Amino acid sequence: MGHDHIMVSLAAAHYTNQGIKENKKLSANIVDEALLEKADRSGCISGSKADKSDLFEYTLDDAGVPMISQSPVTMVCSVEDIYKTTGFENFICTIDAAYAAEEVLTEEGKIDYRTLKPVLFEMPTYEYLKTGDVIGKCMSFGKEK
């Protein structure tokens, strides 16, 4: 994957996959600890059985892609390809636009992950992990001294 691409892997049975395939667009909304309860609730409800559009405040971009207003970082993406694996659809996406809350940006306008502390969902244990601690600089561990 290049720096301008992401992969979004969703269980093939998810209702939202239909809309993504129809529209060839999606938004990836980064979850932080403040947003976690609502995000978890969203995962507990099937969109085929209940309207989840009222779980989050959202805005639409120019192409009509919903973006969660409370998300500290949102990427609007176009689907380039779909790779199917057992039970999953993997959407290969180009990032068309990215939006970040000012409070998670450095003075240079880059995302500060120490401030953002995105939550990761770890699949085998079904646990949420908070990130954000710097443990070293890239290419600093393997250099000869």
Each predicted region: which residue ranges?
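Basic, polyanion-binding surface patches
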Residues: 1-145
